[in-house]
Amino acid sequence: MEMRQPAVAGQFYPLHCENLEKELTRCFEGLEIREREVFGAVCPHAGYIYSGKVAAHVYATLPEADTYVLFGPNHTGYGSPVSLSRETWKTPLGTIDVDLELADGFLGSIVDTDELGHTYEHSIEVQLPFLQYRFGRDFKILPICMGMQDKDTAVEVGSLVADLVSESGKRAVIIASSDFTHYETAEHARETDSEVIDAILKLDVPGMYDSLYRRNASVCGYGPIAAMLSASQKLGGSRATLLEYANSGDVSGDMSAVVGYAAIIVE
């Protein structure tokens, strides 16, 4: 069996199972686990020390599902423009299988089966220990890495995912992995991010793209967010909530060049 090995264990999160569990416990500290009818979410993907607590706000609300669809941006430039992994994924907490039944539905579509896009990419990998911590082993994933993030591509991919999920009758939750503004002052990042987040909270994909262009925003996973929004709405999601917003300066103390992080759910 082909295995997608962890690329950033020991960098973005602890390498050893025991330390990783401790770090995840820290991230969830003070949060009540209260499952909500979540169709989709936006989660950050920085090192857990910086964005783990923000991500935990989302994971504390997620319901159990058969499959978690994970959209992540392609930071490496490797692989297909939109790539789907079929390999089993390994983390320090164990292995997770891909939902091959759903994966088969992408044949002949804009989404290619391609492992190279995933081999070194961290954006999806860093979400998986959160899922394992919350739900153990009883779920599958559908990991889709997006190098092409234009609106038409994102909406097409999101719409296709919604159709496949509906036809399957499975319970699925769609997670978009994205950080927000990169390396601006905390004040500037908050201004830019609040405009982009406002559009997301209105479930307004064209409006989000307008904000990105107008503000020249460095949100890395805008395509995954748009794909998640279009899929979530097609599956019945009708309102979005911002659960938490923070930036790297809140941890490092350096407010001169921060990365913004948001936890958003669509119900």
From Swiss-Prot:
Belongs to the MEMO1 family. NCBIfam families: AmmeMemoSam_B, PRK00782.1. Signal peptide: none annotated. This is MEMO1 family protein MA_0601. Pfam families: Memo (PF01875). It comes from the Archaea. PANTHER family: PROTEIN MEMO1 (PTHR11060:SF0). InterPro entries: MEMO1_fam. It comes from Methanosarcina acetivorans (strain ATCC 35395 / DSM 2834 / JCM 12185 / C2A).
